[in-house]
Amino acid sequence: MVLTDLNDNVVEPEFLSVDWELNSAGKNGYPFYMEKEIMEQPEAIKNTIKDRIVNGLPDFTSDGVPDSLFTDCDRICVVACGTAMHAGLVAQALVKSIVHVQMDVELASEFMYSDPVIDEKTLVIAVSQSGETIDTLEALKYAKRQGAKCLSVINVKGSSIARESDYVLYTAAGPEIAVASTKAYTTQLSVFYLVVAKMALLRGVYTEEQTKSFIAELERVPEVMQKVLEKRRDIHVIAKKILEAKDLFMIGRGLDYSILLEGSLKLKEVSYIHSEAYASGELKHGPIALITTNTPVVATVTQEKLMSKELSNIKEVKSRGADIVLFIKEALSGDLDTEYQVIKLPDMQDEFMVLPASVALQLLAYYVSSDKGFDVDKPRNPVSYTHLRAHETDQYL
């Protein structure tokens, strides 16, 4: 057999080793891949971070990523789509609050059309599970032409985005078969936590001891995530109560809002319930008009500094007749309205609570979809985002 390129030139095949077992692509007794992949997240995160922690500190030596990549940039720009973009929003909040470096998150599909301010002092981070998301790939190529350094966070080795990038940080999620991404999202987050710790240390924001403390909390994530998975029956009970909802709203502040955008996407993607996530403070600017008797509202409260404001917003929608589903950090769950449906999330430092909370939201979406009798792994109207229409990008090639 002879391989040729599009110009009929003979090319040598490039062989890549796949670092997962064949049986990891099976359902292993689960009814759907999505449930299996949700349950695999503690191990996936452990595998993603373990070789990047040396003596308690973040280390990207094995990835070939130099420290200068994180010190020589004036600003960071994440380009991504869908779930990967939501991972970037969490990273943005952490980088700005901890490292105090400007970080923007751009929808890859809009990036090239917005005349972005990109130069050689910009670090562009492309995020994609498959590494073949065409909008993200084209955004990355555009950024490189502007002189930016490009790092990608990818799950599939040898993918197009990985080959186009200057540097790559691979996640160890393994094969993700379900259309709705779960473990790719949380492993992307775990990589971003390592990047935040590395930047904070290199830029003198954190001492070595502070960095070790941050990393030690990251290493707790698989254990804490497992505790959330053990609450799945409680989450299933709540899911049964929103099966017939036509509309559902999610509200939160700060990091909670970032993960609710992803939670809302998951719910609408697999259950076909119209779901919208709002920053809680924006409710009074119009969305509260949509809240009527028995409207389900999902809220998360994991950030202590924002708790009082968030609980006030929850009371406001409750007074309009909403049915409240509350995911709350256990340490913050003192006196709550007994009419709320509450899931208490195991405690972590506030900046890490997005990880256990994300799993709870994934389970909620999964159970709503499966109980409605849908094929959870294959939502309707599937679209492949890896196919390129030439007329859409010719002007940028």
Task: Spell out what each predicted region is.
Residues 71-220, 253, 300-346, 364, ...:
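Glycine-rich phosphate-binding loops that contact phosphosugars or nucleotide phosphates
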Residues 87-88, 104-105, 134-137, 236-238, ...:
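Extended hydrophobic-aromatic, low-complexity segments
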Residues 396:
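Cationic, low-complexity basic patches in intrinsically disordered or flexible, solvent-exposed regions
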